[in-house]
Amino acid sequence: MLDSVGINTCEGGRMLKKLVFLLITMLLVAPSIILAGCSGGVSDIIALVPQKANLVGEINLSQILSDEDFADIYNRPPKENEDPQTLQDVLDVFEDDSGIDLRDFDRGVFFSDTSVSGDDGGYFGVIIEGDFDGEDLLDAIESSMGGELSVDEYKGYDIYSNEDETSAIAFLSPSVFVIGQISPVKDVIQVKEGNREALGGDVMETYNELGDALIKMVSLQAYLGGETLPDSLPGLPIDLSPFADIEKSTLVLDKQGHTIFMETKLHFSNSKSAESAENLVSLAGLLVDMLPVPEEGQNVVPELLDKLDIERDGSLLTISFEITVSEIEDIIESGNAA
């Protein structure tokens, strides 16, 4: 299970991969919560992120899972009899399969140093806070692995790791744990003990400027441009090179009242690249609108594209999307009626 945060070496890695994936990618959003300090001296888990991270994000899972609007969005569409009928049923099934109740987790902060490639093992971790039972969580991990985790003491903390010690989990207090590759797990422990500098600078400043949002993320793109992004798409005359000039990007997903919104801001090194990217995003919307769409989606795609707003101010490109819960329900009903 631990391998899924880093290297997939054992069968048990699949379950932690599912857990981490759910914690950082669920797109249901709701108002964020103001969290009280947790025991063990951890007042805010963002303060445990190491300075070397150039990507950091936050998800408030408890509000996502308890929001009635989003539960209704899942519950409304007709389903097969064998499928989970409600969102709570989905969570129950996941708990039955994995031994992990996602409702025990309140909030997660994920972080990465994107300059460390997968060939070098990568650098990614998630710090999670909630009301969970550590022994039950370890039992679930070991059950999925079919064996025991290795345990090593590090600066007064037990680090539980997979067989090749590439990925690990450590409990920082009764209500906080960190999972990820073993290097960032150790770095978080060092930050907590005052032996390593916590996140600061432009990443932390931008993170704070994003305010209270259910899901938010900031990334410095210094290592994400030309090294990982192709210049074009195979078979299509589309130039992707302007995106290599992104210096910083942010993402916010939130819900206020019954309205959901998403906003992505791309900060380019120059206005020319931002303008080219703006034209490319607009072109992509036109291409999607022209593509053949299955009958059940013919009413959905145009409505969603109409919700997309693209604005540019010099070297800053902003892409936003806003929709109400009732509009989502109408789209679902129109899709079912097609």
Predicted feature locations:
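Single conserved position on a long alpha-helix in the C-terminal lobe of the eukaryotic protein kinase
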Residues: 57, 100-201, 264, 319-333
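An internal, short helix-loop-strand segment that often contains or flanks glycine-aspartate motifs
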Residues: 68-103, 148-258, 274, 290, ...
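Bacterial signal peptide processing site
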Residues: 39-41
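Bacterial N-terminal signal peptides
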Residues: 24-33
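A cross-kingdom marker for long, charged
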Residues: 289-338
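Short, Lys/Arg-enriched N-terminal segments with co-localized hydrophobic residues
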Residues: 1-14
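C-terminal motif of bacterial Sec signal peptides marking the signal peptidase cleavage site
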Residues: 35-37
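One face of beta-strands
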Residues: 55-57, 124-130, 247-253, 258-266, ...
